[in-house]
Amino acid sequence: LTGRAGRRGIDKEGNALVCWSPFVPFADVVGQASSQDFVLRSAFRPTYNMVANLVVTRTRAEAELLLSRSFGQFQMDRRTGGKRSLVRALEARLGVLEARGFADGWRLEPRGRPLVRVFNEADLLVVESLASGLLEGLGPADIAAVASCLTFHRRGPGRSEPPARKGEINRRILGIIELAEDLVAEERRHGVPSVEPPDPGFSTAIRRWAAGDDLSEVLTDEWSGGEFVRNIRLVADLLGQLAEVGTTSVARSARR
């Protein structure tokens, strides 16, 4: 499992260097290296962000060669006998980008360029929301509330209740939900698996906190302190990205 060629099953023997650490017993390192039970599975899958970055940094032929030589493709070939291809997955996502006006062949349109710097499970939906103006004209607390529907996923059974149609924040979130439904339909036409839909379940809590409410007032039985902090960090990370790729108005609110 060492080295690119070794991982792909080309080399019979590989060499690895393991950095010494006072916190890791040497016996544990030996056990991992000699184990016959350790299975490495690639989680490598093309995302819209990856497609966008390949488009701006590689030719189409270079991108296809890169994917075809990846460890992920090697494992996929072993599982499916070559019936599935990361290159086809890339082409499918590129087809979605073209259909949505974010790409023209192997070239990003201006509205698709933010994808290069958006790292989110719902990366394309984030950029769709930006392009549709659904994040414009919001104050810091409001943009945090709206952005939270792009990062939050309720744990356990059930889904969050859809927001009421009253109120600007709710209208923006409903707009993003409608965009997501359109995007899912497009992805189905291209055979692209969809991510989880937007979830408004954290919007009220983060808006109250961002507006200055005391944390003890915001936390309820629904949120543990750790879960609240984790979701705050996810929203903060997305806002940091929006501050880099958004319009002047969006960037100003996202930074605050």
Q: How does the language model describe each region?
A:
Residues G31-Q36, A122-D123:
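Short secondary-structure boundary/capping segments
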Residues G158-R256:
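C-terminal amphipathic alpha-helical interaction region
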Residues N15-P25, V96, L108-L115, P163-R171:
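A glycine-rich phosphate-binding loop feature that marks nucleotide/adenosyl-phosphate handling sites
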Residues R4-R8, C19, L54, R100, ...:
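Conserved, well-folded catalytic cores of nucleic-acid-processing
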Residues L124-E178:
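Leucine-rich, amphipathic alpha-helical/linker segments
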Residues L1-Q32:
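Conserved segment of the helicase C-terminal RecA-like domain
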Residues G6, P22-V24, Q36, R45, ...:
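Short, glycine-/Ser/Thr-/acidic-enriched flexible segments
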Residues A43-S148:
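C-terminal accessory/connector segments of nucleic-acid motor ATPases
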